[in-house]
Amino acid sequence: MSSFHATTIFAVQHNGKSAMSGDGQVTFGQAVVMKHTARKVRKLFNGKVLAGFAGSVADAFTLFEMFEAKLEEYNGNLKRASVELAKEWRSDKVLRKLEAMLIVMNQDTLLLVSGTGEVIEPDDGILAIGSGGNYALSAGRALKTYAGENLSAKDIAKAALKIAGEICVYTNDQIILEELE
C-alpha cells in the first residue's frame, strides 16, 4: 500500500470542544478498495484522548498500542507521550520503516506526530492528514472561520471530511466521528 493513499483524518478544537473524524476506506494498491468501514479514529486513555491515523493499517495498530503505552507511562500527559513516541519511532530501526502519521488530541492540546520526529501543534486548532488532508483542512478552516458561531466542533469535523470525500478518490463517506467534551 502506498503511504497515506487510503484515508483522511481531520481534527478540530472549537468553542471548548474537540472532535476528530476519519473516513472508512482502506485501499489496496492504487486500484482496489478493500474495506469501506475501517475505524481509523479511536478513543484512548479511558476516553480522554482521541487518536487518528493515516497510512498502513498494520503500522497504525502498532503505533496506537505504543502511544497508549506512552500515555499510561506519562499519566496522560499528551505532549510528553507524543514526544517520547516520536523519539522512539524515529530512532528505532524497525519502527523507522513504519508508514503512518498520527493526529492525537485531548481537551486542551492537538498534535501531529510523525516517524521523522516531528510533533507539531497547529496555531489554529485544526489538523488534517492523509490523501484528502489538504481538502479537509481547507474546508475545516473555512467552516471554523466563517460559520464557526453556528457550528460545533463535531459539525465542522463531519462537514470537512464529507467535503474531502467528495474530492479525494481515496476518501469515502463512511465517516467515523469522535468528540471530547
Curated annotation (Swiss-Prot):
Na(+) binds at G165, C168, T171. It is found in: Cytoplasm. InterPro entries: ATP-dep_Prtase_HsIV_su, Ntn_hydrolases_N, Proteasome_sua/b, Proteasome_suB-type. GO terms for cellular component: HslUV protease complex; proteasome core complex. The keyword Hydrolase applies. The active site is at S2. PROSITE patterns: PROTEASOME_BETA_2 (PS51476). The keyword Cytoplasm applies. It is an enzyme of class 3 (hydrolase). Its EC number is 3.4.21.-. GO terms for biological process: proteolysis involved in protein catabolic process. Keywords: Cytoplasm, Hydrolase, Metal-binding, Protease, Serine protease, Sodium. GO terms for molecular function: metal ion binding; serine-type peptidase activity; threonine-type endopeptidase activity. Protease subunit of a proteasome-like degradation complex. Belongs to the peptidase T1B family. HslV subfamily. A double ring-shaped homohexamer of ClpQ is capped on each side by a ring-shaped ClpY homohexamer. The assembly of the ClpQ/ClpY complex is dependent on binding of ATP. This is ATP-dependent protease subunit ClpQ. It comes from Bacillus velezensis (strain DSM 23117 / BGSC 10A6 / LMG 26770 / FZB42).
